[in-house]
Amino acid sequence: MATDIDMLIDLGLDLSDSDLDEDPPEPAESRRDDLESDSSGECSSSDEDMEDPHGEDGPEPILDAARPAVRPSRPEDPGVPSTQTPRPTERQGPNDPQPAPHSVWSRLGARRPSCSPEQHGGKVARLQPPPTKAQPARGGRRGRRRGRGRGGPGAADGLSDPRRRAPRTNRNPGGPRPGAGWTDGPGAPHGEAWRGSEQPDPPGGQRTRGVRQAPPPLMTLAIAPPPADPRAPAPERKAPAADTIDATTRLVLRSISERAAVDRISESFGRSAQVMHDPFGGQPFPAANSPWAPVLAGQGGPFDAETRRVSWETLVAHGPSLYRTFAGNPRAASTAKAMRDCVLRQENFIEALASADETLAWCKMCIHHNLPLRPQDPIIGTTAAVLDNLATRLRPFLQCYLKARGLCGLDELCSRRRLADIKDIASFVFVILARLANRVERGVAEIDYATLGVGVGEKMHFYLPGACMAGLIEILDTHRQECSSRVCELTASHIVAPPYVHGKYFYCNSLF
């Protein structure tokens, strides 16, 4: 067995700071063991290496210069002999009494057992990273040294770490290291947390040894779920609620038959006609001495566009008078706006085109006279009705036409409302009407001229009244001849000439 000094060197103790300065000289055999253990600047070997001084490669030659076994005492306590502390013969167990607080062993702390991590069971040993490949041995016992005399997993780390090849006297110049310097982190077995947990020494400062980090807890590890058994039955899924008509609604629907009668339907038609006979409620527009008197009063019967035809010059001359009538009678203008909206949504294709030209020509007249475009105006305020009616009637045709021309779809044209999307008369009508309807819906006080693509100081010269009707009828006829689809030809023809030919098969009425 090794001597006390050999044991202290094995534990990394600086003998200059220990309490064994005044130990008596040891015999030559002890000095020889000391030379063998201190033959290199590295840490000494483990207890197993010390018990077997001759390794597999044969005995190591003894160096010529022998280090003295006893060093002089420190200058701060000259002449004070230190009591030699006997080395314990066995490692202390958990129930053994602790040494005296003034002894070297109390400062060093309990030694860790020289056991390999393979002896530790559980999941910690399995989670340890694979050991680093050791460097080839250089002969003698140096090739068999492991770490700091321990049989831990990093047996070769002591050879590759430059900090462990430093002289023992430079490791802790301020005195002996604390006893808990090489203890593992809390809850970690010996040797589990030492690999890769040391922090590098601060440059130019004293080396400190902190507490090692413990391995990660098992709760932080990604654990894959167990594979599902394909033979296991699938979990039951709740059936969605049935989408049915509730009983109360069914009773309401059937109760219509109890109230439906021919006399009741006739009375409903009579009351509606009486309301429409005087839609303004006795407060119509003042039409005395007005060139617009025939159209300001209510009229029965269908609308005939030819009887209301006016030239652009007439509109420029008498348009401001009608504009002032709308602006000076807000209640009558509100009633006229509601009635116009209902009429526009029931027009056929030719009448809808005439309404589009009416709206754009009215805007051109206002721009010509520098009049504000008012959303409360009955003509401008009902632009959305013109747009909806035209889109409903032309949608089946425009799906094929716009795609063949490489233009945006109808819905995209109306939602984007960009002047740059205007490429022909069809896109012009829908983009301009969509921009006007959007301003009215937003409730702006006035609509600027730029909404119609008119710059500052410009007039609406690019639009001629009647271009909507003439242009859209032209593209219907042109595309009908160019497109090879029979369905497209039938659709375009029925839009222009809509008399009934085929499609309605019966009329069923069990109530009256």
From Swiss-Prot:
Motif residue range(s): Nuclear localization signal: 110-138
Posttranslational modification: Methylated within the RGG box possibly by host PRMT1. When hypomethylated, ICP27 is exported to the cytoplasm earlier and more rapidly. Phosphorylated.
Keyword Nucleus: no
Region (RGG-box): 138-152
Residue positions of motif Nuclear export signal: 5-17
Quaternary context: Homodimer. Interacts with host RBP1; this interaction facilitates the RNA polymerase recruitment to viral transcription sites. Interacts (via the RGG box) with host ALYREF/THOC4; this interaction recruits ALYREF to viral replication compartments and probably directs viral mRNA to the TAP/NFX1 pathway. Interacts with host ALYREF2. Interacts (via the RGG box) with host SRPK1; this interaction relocalizes SRPK1 to the nucleus and seems to alter its activity. Interacts with ICP4; this interaction modulates ICP4 DNA-binding activity.
Protein name as catalogued: mRNA export factor
Organism: Human herpesvirus 1 (strain 17) (HHV-1)
